[in-house]
Amino acid sequence: MERRTVLITGCSQGGIGSALAEAFHQRGFHVFATARKTEKMTHLRDLDWMTLIPLDVTQESQISAAVELIQKHTGGTLDYLVNNAGDGYIIPVLDCDQVHGRQIFEVNFWGPLRMIQEFSPLLIAARGTIVNINSVASETLPLWLGIYSSSKAALLALSETLRLELKPFGVQVLSVMTGAVQTMIFQTNYRLPPDSAYVAWEKQIAAQAEGSEQASRMSATVYAERVVGDILNRRGGITYRGQMASFAYWVVALMPRFLRDLVTVKMAGIS
C-alpha cells in the first residue's frame, strides 16, 4: 500500500510542528518535515519515512526546491500540507517596530499563501488537504498581541475563502484555532522599549512573553494527536484545539463585547 504524504512547516524540536510530525509518522505517513535549519530537527533524523528539508517560508527559492523534491518522491502529488511555521510578537501596538511587524506578516500570512500557491498542483492532483495552524488570539484579540493577532486573523480570512474556492477541485481546507499548548518556544528576558508608555505593566507583559502567565497548557503531544485526528477525518472548516480553545470559542460566540472587553483587560492585568 502506498504511503500517504504530508509536508509540515516549522518542525523545530520542542514545538507544535515537531509533535505533528511525530503524530503523522506514527500513523504510517511519509512525513516531509521542514524548518529553517535542519539541525533543529535532529531528533527526527533517524525515523524511517521522515524526510528533513531546510525551508524558510519567506524564501520562494526554497519553497520551489521543496516542491521539486517532493514531486520526485511522490510522482507529483501531496496529500496534506500543514502550514505550522509562525512567529510571535508580544508588544503594545504603540511600541511595534514596523519592520519587525512586516516580518511577522511575511511568516504568518504570506508564508502560508506562498506554500499553498506553490504546492497547489500537487494538492489538487491528490485531492488533498491544506491545514493552517492558527490561534484563538485571532478571535479573542488579547492585549499586547495586536500585530500577531492581526496576522492570524488575516490567515483565517484567507483560509475560509480558499475553503470555498478549492471545493471544485476536491481540496479541503482546515483552520486549527490553537489555545494554550506547552512548547519550548517562548521569549526570555523580555524588555519593553525604554521610552514605552506601558512600562508600568512591563512585568505583566513579560510574563505573557515568557509563557509564565498561564500555568495550564495542553501537552504538544496530546494537541498533535487530536489535530491529526481532525485532519484525517476530512473535517474542513475550523476546529478548536489546545487548552482553553473551546472556552475561547464560546466567549467570542456568546459573550457581549463589553463583557469581553472587561475580561480581556483583567486578564492582561491592567486597569
Swiss-Prot record:
Known pathway: Secondary metabolite biosynthesis
Pfam families: adh_short (PF00106)
GO biological process: phosphatidic acid biosynthetic process; secondary metabolite biosynthetic process; triglyceride catabolic process
GO MF annotations in UniProt: acylglycerone-phosphate reductase (NADP+) activity; triacylglycerol lipase activity
Disulfide bridge positions per record: none
Any one GO cellular component localisation term in the record: endoplasmic reticulum
Residues annotated as the enzyme's active site: Y148 (proton acceptor), K152 (lowers pka of active site tyr)
Enzyme class: oxidoreductase
Residues binding NADP(+), per UniProt: I8, T34, K40, D56, N84, Y148, K152, V181, T183
Key words, A-Z: NADP, Oxidoreductase
EC number(s) on file: 1.1.1.-
Protein family membership: Belongs to the short-chain dehydrogenases/reductases (SDR) family.
Its biological purpose: Short-chain dehydrogenase; part of the gene cluster that mediates the biosynthesis of the indole diterpenes penitrems. The geranylgeranyl diphosphate (GGPP) synthase ptmG catalyzes the first step in penitrem biosynthesis via conversion of farnesyl pyrophosphate and isopentyl pyrophosphate into geranylgeranyl pyrophosphate (GGPP). Condensation of indole-3-glycerol phosphate with GGPP by the prenyl transferase ptmC then forms 3-geranylgeranylindole (3-GGI).
Name used for this protein in its record: Short-chain dehydrogenase ptmH
Species this protein is from: Penicillium ochrochloron
Source lineage: Eukaryota, Fungi, Dikarya, Ascomycota, Pezizomycotina
